Amino acid sequence: MSKENKTTDFGFTQVPWEEKQKKVAGVFHSVAAKYDLMNDLMSFGIHRIWKKQTIAKSGVRKGDNVLDLAGGTGDLAYKFCQMVGQQGKVILSDINSSMLEVGKEKLTNKGCVGNIEYVQANAECLPFPDNYFDCITISFGLRNVTDKDKALASMCRVLKPGGRLLVLEFSKPIIPLLSKVYDEYSFKALPFLGKIITQDAESYKYLAESIRKHPDQQTLKQMMYDAGFDNVEYQNMTGGIVALHIGYKY
């Protein structure tokens, strides 16, 4: 079947393959201005711990080239700028211009200049040379990508041999009671918060649905192997609500 006739998930709705990117763009154009505030409210601030653990596992050192993909408002990129020093370089990349603009303004105001670039790019066809980055991170972005297999292969292409990919993403809770509470919170509280804070309940309804349609821990692990990564491992956080996958290129 050609891509023109294929459909894909947009939350719980099936949409034409080529339309998902436009619909996801609409979501993030809508939420960009309040993105950081909503992250704190929705996760009770725990997203900062998840990201801190990701940074600690990244192995980033002075002089490294780092790609923070779907980097949004720059939480990871800001720390990486400090870690690589002026000898290294961080590229904060996002497909969404609104998110990228918020991230650029935020990091510039924090004094993050000189060793960072901002690139609007599609994860499925990254505009970077082969074997270029020491480390790639994608935090809460992979589930919004239309062709995840193609994106993972693109990440593998631009990663140096010996480099590593870290995927921080919502996943499948491993505790049944937690899963029930999480479902109740996701489908009721998130759209309500979205309506109150951003006047946009639908975008946060999509968020809850997109999490449920994202591959589980083992499936994503295999997808990373299939894309060319080796020694893929994952660590569950907060009972599997979030998982950090790490894969290496050799």
UniProtKB/Swiss-Prot annotation:
Q: List the top taxonomic levels of the source.
A: Bacteria, Pseudomonadati, Pseudomonadota, Gammaproteobacteria, Thiotrichales
Organism, scientific name? Francisella tularensis subsp. mediasiatica (strain FSC147)
Function according to Swiss-Prot or TrEMBL: Methyltransferase required for the conversion of demethylmenaquinol (DMKH2) to menaquinol (MKH2) and the conversion of 2-polyprenyl-6-methoxy-1,4-benzoquinol (DDMQH2) to 2-polyprenyl-3-methyl-6-methoxy-1,4-benzoquinol (DMQH2).
CDD domains, A to Z? AdoMet_MTases (cd02440)
| EC code(s) of this entry | 2.1.1.163, 2.1.1.201
- Keyword Transmembrane: yes or no? no
Which cysteines are disulphide-bonded? none
Q: In the UniProt record, does the keyword Protein transport occur?
A: no
A GO molecular function term, named singly, is: 2-methoxy-6-polyprenyl-1,4-benzoquinol methyltransferase activity
Family classification: Belongs to the class I-like SAM-binding methyltransferase superfamily. MenG/UbiE family.
Q: GO:BP terms for this protein? A: aerobic respiration; menaquinone biosynthetic process; methylation
The gene designation is ubiE
The top EC class, named as a word, is: transferase
Q: In which pathway does it act?
A: Quinol/quinone metabolism; menaquinone biosynthesis; menaquinol from 1,4-dihydroxy-2-naphthoate: step 2/2; Cofactor biosynthesis; ubiquinone biosynthesis
State the protein's name. Ubiquinone/menaquinone biosynthesis C-methyltransferase UbiE
**Which keywords appear in this protein's UniProt record, sorted alphabetically?**
Menaquinone biosynthesis, Methyltransferase, S-adenosyl-L-methionine, Transferase, Ubiquinone biosynthesis
Which reactions is this enzyme annotated as catalysing? a 2-demethylmenaquinol + S-adenosyl-L-methionine = a menaquinol + S-adenosyl-L-homocysteine + H(+); a 2-methoxy-6-(all-trans-polyprenyl)benzene-1,4-diol + S-adenosyl-L-methionine = a 5-methoxy-2-methyl-3-(all-trans-polyprenyl)benzene-1,4-diol + S-adenosyl-L-homocysteine + H(+)
Which superkingdom?
Bacteria
NCBIfam families membership: MenG_MenH_UbiE, PRK00216.1-1, PRK00216.1-3, PRK00216.1-5
**Which amino acid positions bind S-adenosyl-L-methionine, per UniProt?**
73, 94, 122-123, 139
